[in-house]
Swiss-Prot record:
EC class: ligase
SUPFAM superfamilies assigned: Adenine nucleotide alpha hydrolases-like, MesJ substrate recognition domain-like
Catalytic activity: cytidine(34) in tRNA(Ile2) + L-lysine + ATP = lysidine(34) in tRNA(Ile2) + AMP + diphosphate + H(+)
Species in which this protein is naturally found: Rhodococcus erythropolis (strain PR4 / NBRC 100887)
Lineage: Bacteria, Bacillati, Actinomycetota, Actinomycetes, Mycobacteriales
Gene giving rise to this polypeptide: tilS
Name this polypeptide is given: tRNA(Ile)-lysidine synthase
Enzyme Commission number, as recorded: 6.3.4.19
Residue numbers binding ATP: 34-39
Pfam family, one: TilS
Cellular component aspect of the GO annotation: cytoplasm
InterPro entries, per database record: Rossmann-like_a/b/a_fold (IPR014729), TilS/TtcA_N (IPR011063), tRNA_Ile_lys_synt (IPR012094), tRNA_Ile_lys_synt_N (IPR012795), tRNA_Ile_lys_synt_subst-bd (IPR015262)
Function, as annotated: Ligates lysine onto the cytidine present at position 34 of the AUA codon-specific tRNA(Ile) that contains the anticodon CAU, in an ATP-dependent manner. Cytidine is converted to lysidine, thus changing the amino acid specificity of the tRNA from methionine to isoleucine.
Amino acid sequence: MLLPETPALLALRQAVRAWTVAFEPRRRVVVALSGGADSLALTAAAVAETDSVDALIVDHRLQPGSDAVARSAADQALALGCRTATVLTVDVAEGGSLEAAAREARYSALRDARTDLPVLLGHTLDDQAETVLLGLSRGSGGRSIQGMAAFDAPWGRPLLGIRRSVTRAACVDLGITPWEDPHNNNPEFTRVRLRHEALPLLEEILGGGVAEALARTATQLREDGEALDEYAEALLLRAVVDGEVEVDTLAEAPTAIRRRALRAWLLQGGAKALTDKQLRAVDALVIDWRGQGGVAIGGGTPEARLVAARRRGRLILGFEDRRRV
């Protein structure tokens, strides 16, 4: 399909072209297509700027008629020039956050179906701004407000510098009607309220440019974070001996680098859903040692908990029988 040369479509093509040059020299990609404006616009630009595009459409089966929506998205993908368009049906786990469960099911299906290709996602600058605000609300440090990466294999996000208004304009230019997901207007979801209430209010109070400023901040923090991670990795290489960490080597490092090294070591050892409180408690074993006991870390089993402890000048990580607690 030959795309018209409108400002919106040219901006999208430039964004996809830049992403491809940086991350996918093979010029072969998969696009995660919902049928919404963002992913449709991304699909059109990807077809124009790469050699091969396969579309994957996930049917969460959470709404009546979702199968028809998925089939329509597949038809649109083929009309735009995708090589293939495949509908993936998933089961969304009940209980807890519906939004989180749907996301987990969707990403799992996309990961399984992508073969060895990167999966392009239609996240825009607006999505990035919302992600930063959500991270701020958690208050868990700079990592939580770094936002989404342009490429976090296998996930690619070429449109992080593109406003949502541009993707909608592109769909108008293409003469295609995007699907409007009812969940995107459901105030039960925190992100929806940020989108429709919090961000517009901030724009009004602060005089505009808030979304761009939040996205710019995320980029700067991610660049800083990547540099700190490199220093932390080098520190960990020096400190780890037979899977254990020498306390004296860690204690010499600046706090930001030391805690990043500890976080990496804990995650490598099987920690799950590591909290700031847990990380600080493990850090205290290094810099505030008073003979305290080990620190329980998420990632254990029903029978045993994962514990970080200090023994003979080293940190060790192992399982402890819950019946002994």
